[in-house]
Swiss-Prot record:
One of its GO terms (biological process) is iron-sulfur cluster assembly. The lineage of its organism: Bacteria, Pseudomonadati, Pseudomonadota, Gammaproteobacteria, Enterobacterales. The keyword Nucleotide-binding applies. PROSITE patterns: HSP70_1 (PS00297), HSP70_2 (PS00329), HSP70_3 (PS01036). Keywords: ATP-binding, Chaperone, Nucleotide-binding. Belongs to the heat shock protein 70 family. Chaperone involved in the maturation of iron-sulfur cluster-containing proteins. Has a low intrinsic ATPase activity which is markedly stimulated by HscB. Involved in the maturation of IscU. This is Chaperone protein HscA homolog.
Length: 616
């Protein structure tokens, strides 16, 4: 098979020139950056030998600081010290205020409802704050490697949605970084242990960080990681261990709850030091606020046992969601500094029936996996391993209504890979769907290459939008594409296999990519027009069905107004004025609101007919 370089046609790197890449673990509490040097992945330290960078930024009028310096200002200047910004990524202001009502920041909403944080440096959004953390990590890597980075792999939680992932990409772009790939954190941890090239089967990744707990159940098949289930607790982490132990020491030392900040800081520092020491020792001596006493590992275990049990309950739920039993799990990977606690390792081992993998520093394992992946994607592997560099040369997708192409797997995605997307029916009672597989970078079907067609039949006859079809694209290591369409409620499915790159030369691929750039603006306008025409057709189809069923609910005058609005929409939909079509759709919606309300009332009355209030 032809081996395809990641670089753009005509811009290939010199054959023996090593490119600089890094893996970044952008964490809630701490972040790290790692790279591969002399064949070994390692995290990079600052000038004081510290590998972790606190995910904290302190803003002032004159500038900002990131990391340890910023963290010291958390208690002194709370409003201008932003921490745990990862929790805010990709969320609306309303969502943030509902989820995290006790945040000490002053927020404003942007025009599109996104959060803006009031600081001494002005209004800042979570993307900007994340970008400042990424810049600090990139600067550390640039200095250590003595050169600018050619690309980075950034890790994200497996449960991150599209908005959160896009926010992370935007932050990287703002930081001046080229993102080779966003990699799921549990997948990165598995890669660090080499599980991506080992035995196929189910892998559990137990991630207990400072502020959150995540459990991910993965299935490895032919080098492809599939996330079967995720779970956890966003309000449970190692910080809770610290607070329980601090409360116990406070009680033993008779320290008032509301003593001054200096004593509270001293108490917390002593608590954290004791927790760390108890990972190796059976007991530790604690000195705080003039009090000295012994804390045993057994006492600490009793305090945290209920919290550890909560994590195992989340593991049980995730296994149930994944449809697998604990004894089916081949390996358990430990991630997060709090997994150093002996009780955690012991209970996790008992739960899964096997000792967890702990040989790699749990704080560093995700960053190390990201660095390994970045080294592959940037093109540093020798020829004997070049297969890992094979990529999809052109985007793969599907034809949707209006002759549009919906991309499912973007070009330059490394293979093997699997991606899925959900689609729905366009017409009432639709029982079949034609699946048209496309290849190319343009927005319209007429400008892309047709790869294959097949039909999915046996879809239940439901109203438009009622049936949900999941279409899965899977490309194996040989570049063979399998497309499967499955109706979710019935399980009925159909599939086809095709070789996407068959028959295309490198020059043809380059030409298709060049065309996509040359016609980008024109294509976007064409797509917007096609989308509005599809929406107009959907609105008219729905309206005609409603009128056929319930026209008696309208007076002659009301019917005339609706008919006029529909006729106008039908007329402008034949043209190419996007704004006119959009306004005509809004007008139909406005003129039919009362009609829709009457239809709803009539449906409710029919449903309740013959039933008493008590029955309802």
């Amino acid at each position: 098979m032809a081996l395809l370089q990641i670089s753009e046609p005509g811009l290939s790197a010199a054959p023996h020139q090593r490119r600089l890449a890094a893996g970044i673990d952008l964490g809630t509490t701490n972040s790290l950056v790692a790279t591969v040097r002399s064949g070994q992945a390692e995290t990079l330290a600052d000038h004081e030998g510290r590998h972790l960078l606190p995910s904290v930024v302190h803003y002032q009028q004159q500038g900002h600081s990131v990391g340890y310096d910023a963290r010291t200002n958390a208690a002194l200047d709370t409003a201008n010290t932003i921490s745990s910004v990862k929790r805010l990524m990709g969320r609306s202001l309303a969502d943030i205020q509902q989820r995290y009502p006790h945040l000490p920041y002053q927020f404003q909403a942007s025009e599109n409802g996104l959060p803006m944080i009031e600081t001494a440096a002005g209004l800042l959004n979570p993307v900007r704050v994340s970008a400042d953390i990424l810049k600090a990590l990139a600067a550390r890597a640039t200095e250590a490697l003595a050169g600018e980075l050619d690309g980075v792999v950034i890790t994200v939680p497996a449960y991150f949605d599209d908005a959160q992932r896009q926010g992370t990409k935007d932050a990287a772009r703002l930081a001046g970084l080229h993102v080779l790939r966003l990699l799921n954190e549990p997948t990165a941890a598995a890669i660090a242990y080499g599980l991506d090239s080992g035995q196929e089967g189910v892998i559990a990744v137990y991630d207990l960080g400072g502020g959150t707990f995540d459990i991910s159940i993965l299935r490895l098949s032919r080098g492809v990681f599939e996330v079967l289930a995720t779970g956890g607790d966003s309000a449970l982490g190692g910080d809770d261990f610290d607070h329980l132990l601090a409360d116990y020491i406070r009680e033993q030392a008779d320290i008032p709850d509301r003593s001054d900040n200096r004593v509270q800081r001293e108490l917390l520092d002593a608590t954290i030091a004791a927790k760390i020491a108890l990972s190796d020792a059976d007991s530790v001596t604690v000195n705080v606020a003039g009090w000295q006493g012994e804390i045993s590992r057994e006492q600490f275990n009793e305090l945290i046992a209920p919290l550890v049990k909560r994590t195992l309950l989340a593991c049980r739920r995730a296994l149930k969601d994944a449809g697998v039993e604990a004894d089916e799990v081949l390996e358990v990977v430990m991630v997060g500094g709090s997994t150093r606690v002996p009780l955690v390792r012991e209970r996790v081992g008992e739960f899964f029936g096997r000792p967890p993998l702990t040989s790699i520093d749990p704080d560093k394992v995700v960053a190390i996996g990201a660095a390994i992946q970045a080294d592959i994607l940037v093109g540093n592997k020798p020829d004997s391993e070049m297969l890992l560099l094979d990529v999809i040369p052109l985007s793969l997708g599907l034809e949707t209504m209006g002759g549009l192409v919906e991309k499912v797997i973007p070009r330059n995605t490394t293979i093997p890979v699997a991606r899925a997307q959900d689609f729905t029916t366009f017409k009432d009672g639709q029982t079949a769907m034609s699946i048209h597989v496309m290849q190319g970078e343009r927005e319209l079907v007429q400008d892309c290459r047709s790869l294959a067609r097949f039909a999915l039949r046996g879809i239940p006859a439901l109203p438009a939008g009622g049936a949900h079809i999941r279409v899965t694209f899977q490309v194996d290591a040989d570049g063979l594409l399998s497309v499967t369409a499955m109706e979710k409620s019935t399980g009925v499915e159909a599939s086809i296999q095709v070789k996407p790159s068959y028959g295309l030369t490198d020059s043809e691929i380059a030409s298709m990519i060049k065309d996509s750039m040359s016609y980008a603006e024109q294509d976007v306008k064409a797509r917007m027009l096609a989308e509005q025409k599809v929406e107009a057709a959907r609105v008219l189809e729905s309206l005609h069905g409603a009128l056929a069923a319930d026209a008696a609910l309208l007076s002659a005058a009301e019917r005339q107004v609706i008919d006029n609005a529909a006729a106008h929409l039908s007329e402008v939909a034949q043209g190419d004025d996007v704004d006119a079509i959009e306004q005509a759709i809004k007008n139909v919606d406005k003129q039919t609101q009362d009609f829709a309300a009457r239809r709803m009332d009539q449906s409710v009355r029919r449903a309740l007919k013959g039933h008493s209030v008590d029955e309802v």
